[in-house]
Every structure is written in C-alpha cells, then in structure tokens.
C-alpha cells in the first residue's frame, strides 16, 4: 500500500513538471510576439518620419531664391520652425489674397519675394533669429508698392517737440517727412508739443494730415524723453489704434533725405544705432547696473538699437511703450536712472522681444561718422546736436 502511494505521488510530480515545461515555451512565444510588434511599430514610425523629412527637404530646395549655403536654407524655413519670430509678411497666412482696386486678386508677397540678402554681401542682412535687416539694394520697391497700393493702408508717425526743439527742428522734420515718408500712402503726423501757439505752419501733401496735441512740459530733458513712452501708449489706446495700420515713433532732431517707404513696415521694427552697428555686444552702452530694470549683463544682447526710430503695429508699439514705462517707474522707485534713459529700456525690451525687422543705419545716419562704403543711401540724417541751446539742463 505504501509503495502504491509513493508511485502515485511520483506520477503527480512528473505530470506537474510536464505541464510546467509545456507552458514555458508558450509564454516565451508570447513575449517574442510582443517584442516583434513593438519593433514593427518603431520601424514603421521611422519610415514615416524619414518620408516627412525627405519631402520637407525637397520643399526647401524647391525655393528658387535659396542658395547652396546651409545658413541660407535655414533662413527660408517656414515660420513655424522659427521660434515664433517672423517678419510682418511671414506672420500672415500663406497664400492669403487681397482684392485689388481693379477687381483682381493680388497675392501678398512673402519675404523671399521682396527681400534678397545676396544683393548686399558686404553687410549683415539677416539676424540670428532670421529677421531681415533692410539695407539699400535688398528690397524690391516696385513689388511692395504694387501690393500695398491695394491695401489702402494708413501709417502714423509720432514726434515730440518741446521748448526750443520747436524752433530748431520741428518744421524741417515735418517738411522733409512730408516729402519722403511713405510717399503715395495716407499718413497721419501726430505732433506732441508743449505750446501749440508755436506750432509752425506746414503745407502737407493731400494724402497727409496733421494732429497736434499739447503735452505737459518737463523741467528735465531726461524726463521728457522717458515720459514720451507713457504719452505714446495713452494716445494709442485713445485713438491711434483705430486710425492707422502701422505706427512709427521718431525723434524730432533729424531730417529725411530719401524715401522712407513700405519696405520698413513690420510688426515690430527696430533701428540700428549708427555709431554701434559694427561694434561687438561687449562694447555696447547697455545699462550695466543690476539695480536698474534696463540691466543687460555682459555676454547678452544682439544689437544696439536707437530710440530715435522704432515702429510696428499699434498693438506691438503699445506693448513696447508699456513695458519700457514700467521699467522707468521701477527705476524711479529704486532712485536710479538708466544710462541712456528710455533707450536703455528699449534695448532691454528688444532683448526679450526680438524685432521682426531691423533697419540699417542708412535709415538714421550721423554724418559726423563720415560716409563709409556700406552706407549707400541715407534715408534720415541726424541734425546737428545743439544741446547747449535746446536743453534746459545738459
């Protein structure tokens, strides 16, 4: 009896082992199938990605203006590969069409249609974030004018004249602007003046109009310079945003000498400072004191921008003026004043809000520098700086 029980126990163990051994290959087979499925999906995904890359590369190479250099091909990549930074023309929906006055459909020109950096190999024409730097010879005026003629756009221009700046500069500024600024398009000149009785009589082009506003006089010219950010913002909110498509803000102590046209239009436009456009960022006169809201540390910064000219859409200029004035107020609380006042805050703003278009020094040139070979056509020139005559405190 004992022997029979022992035999039965041995048979149970043998059967258990047999079942275990037969189930083990089945488990391994299932795992292998899962691994093969995962590998198959990975291979399929790689094939899809490779196909997309090849098609995209063919698209880039199909653009006729793009050269063989890698940086040029990078520059022409569609805007969604540009970290959200575009020019005005790129920011609109591609292929958008506008109806012309004669009933034809006119396609909005893309950046590569009107801008050719290869025409000026002697200068920097594209920023690291792929925004155009507009130099004489890089833009197609006829193509741009053909498009903007259908848009019936209006461009605004703000200028401040207080104290002795009125007699010394305002009339020359307005008369030259009437001659060269946005020729053939509607323009509104917004003149901010501290004494309207001293406003010069200026006869304007039929497409141009003038709005004069009296502002409070400040004791210090530094305060006048900084308060203009607040004033511009207030006027944009009150009426300018409803009156113009683009807005430029300029200093009064300069004079137009050549066409300042639609090639300058953009969402956020900055002006290179004539004295610093060839310098390295380490030499820029940024605000270097950490306590100031305009502080830019060494090792940071792209260009040095001139506050004498900046522009863009009303919304973008409103944001710019608000942020700059916020920084000015913050500095006042800390009893500090940025080295170059509103210009220091402007440079800080452009550090974190990259301009979509930059104007070369030809658009704001100082003849005291001379006339180097890369300056082909001076659009706006500095007037003689007679600070001892026009400023209350120097």
Swiss-Prot record:
- The answer to whether the entry has keyword Nucleus is no
The cysteines joined by S-S bonds are none
Query: Transmembrane region positions?
Result: 42-60
Binding positions for substrate per the UniProt entry: 160-165, 251-253, 273-276, 285, 385-391
Kindly give the membrane topology term recorded for this protein.
Single-pass type II membrane protein
Instruction: Give residues annotated as binding Mn(2+).
Output: 251, 253
Q: What class of enzyme is it?
A: transferase
Ranges in the topological domain labelled Cytoplasmic: 1-41
Task: Give a single Pfam family match.
Answer: Glyco_transf_6
Domain of life (superkingdom):
Eukaryota
- Cellular component aspect of the GO annotation: Golgi cisterna; Golgi cisterna membrane
The primary location reported for this protein is Golgi
Which ranges of this chain reside in the Lumenal compartment per its record? 61-394
State its cofactor: Mn(2+)
Coiled-coil segments, which residues?
A: none
Q: What is its EC number?
A: 2.4.1.87
Example GO biological process term? carbohydrate metabolic process
Which compartments is it annotated to reside in?
Golgi apparatus, Golgi stack membrane
Q: Where is the active site?
A: 343 (nucleophile)
Extract the SUPFAM superfamilies matched here: Nucleotide-diphospho-sugar transferases
Cofactor binding summary note:
Binds 1 Mn(2+) ion per subunit.
Swiss-Prot/TrEMBL keywords: Glycoprotein, Glycosyltransferase, Golgi apparatus, Manganese, Membrane, Metal-binding, Signal-anchor, Transferase, Transmembrane, Transmembrane helix
Q: Anything noted about its domains?
A: The conserved DXD motif is involved in cofactor binding. The manganese ion interacts with the beta-phosphate group of UDP and may also have a role in catalysis.
Protein family according to the UniProt entry: Belongs to the glycosyltransferase 6 family.
Protein known as: N-acetyllactosaminide alpha-1,3-galactosyltransferase
The major lineage groups are: Eukaryota, Metazoa, Chordata, Craniata, Vertebrata
Task: From the UniProt record, report the name of the gene that encodes this protein.
Answer: Ggta1
